[in-house]
Amino acid sequence: MSNIEVATEKGYNKASLRKICADAGVTTGALYFFFEDKEALFGAIADGPYNELIAILKSHFEEDEALMEQPYDAEEGDHDAFVEELVHHLYQNYDVFHMLLTKAQGSKYENAVDDLADILDETYTKMSAKMGSHFGGKVNKQMVHWLTHMILDAFIHMITHEKDEKKALAHIKKVMNFITKGWTAVIDK
């Protein structure tokens, strides 16, 4: 059983370093040589994929913010390349992200969804303000926040309910087209 499997099965709080060491065929002393504690081991598993997720999102947001300099009219498939990259990353690291969403209580990642919501809220508020300036409207921050959670919830549902990457991609593309077309709803005219 791998470290990820132990953490996924038991969750961060209940994952035993002794069990992880026994399954890996090493002593706890050997583990502590490489990792200060369970948090460091968990970080070694999750930090890379999580940080790459943030980098993918930030890169996409930079592109979207540049688009918002001009009036933007959403078209079907506008975000397909981004969605494909994002879904592929999530599914290349499926066990890690499933663990972060369902078994991270007690770890530094227990608030990962809220942290992502904060990043999305900040970015979407800026983009909505730019979009609103083209329509002569004002951003409805509460609607931006709701939309942020709709998007996050769609991806959380995807990871927690669909193990097949191709099926997940087909469904989430439709969801993203729906959400992208609804962005004008966050502007009060």
Residue ranges of model-derived segments:
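C-terminal/domain-terminus segments
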Residues: 4, 100-117, 170-183
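Short, basic, alpha-helical segments at the C-terminal edge of helix-turn-helix-like DNA-binding modules
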Residues: 17, 47-54, 59-61
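Alpha-helical DNA-contacting segments of helix-turn-helix folds
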Residues: 43-49, 112
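Hydrophobic alpha-helical connector segments
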Residues: 44, 58-89
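Short linear capping/connector segments at secondary-structure termini
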Residues: 67-73, 100-107, 136
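Amphipathic alpha-helical packing segments from all-alpha helical-bundle domains
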Residues: 85-92, 106-132, 142-149
